[in-house]
Amino acid sequence: MSITFHPDGRIDGLNRSSMPTGSLINFVSAKKLGTQSTDSTTFIDITDLSCTITPTTSNSKIYIAGSMNVNKENYTAIFRLMRDSTEIALPSGTGGVNHIMTVYTANNNGAWRATFQWDDTPGDTNPHTYKLQMRTDGGSDPTVHIGGHHDNSSSYS
């Protein structure tokens, strides 16, 4: 079977049934440039960190990964991963703050590298939008900063 790649992005001679299990079919990405801060104790969207992807089959896996610099002078910055309007990536444990990622700084000022990864199986072939949201736990200094630092608005992305 011959495969032809065209300058406009089309590929002839390749279809889903001829691809081996585990093949990467779609790839989308988002990048946060600059900084964002919040004092909110309820979740807010992180601007520029959302992607829409359409699974090719009902058993398609969607792999989501992220890495960012986070600063919170006291206590905890909390993040959750959403598929459309539903929170996903909830750990199986109970109690405490159970979301995709938390950053507890314990009164240590600085920019902390925070990462997460999750694979999702939406179970259909509809387009889905994945996004990351953040909030603060409050504390004596409630502001959460991403891509920056508590005492400096410069970008550290």
Q: What positions do the PLM features span?
A:
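Terminal beta-strand-rich extracellular "head" domains
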Residues: 31, 36-42, 52-61, 65-127, ...
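Generic alpha-helical hydrophobic packing signal
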Residues: 9-10, 50-52
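Glycine-rich, low-complexity segments
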Residues: 2-35
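Short, solvent-exposed loop/turn segments enriched in Ser/Thr/Gly
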Residues: 45-48
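Short intrinsically disordered, low-complexity coil segments enriched in acidic
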Residues: 1, 24-25, 152-157
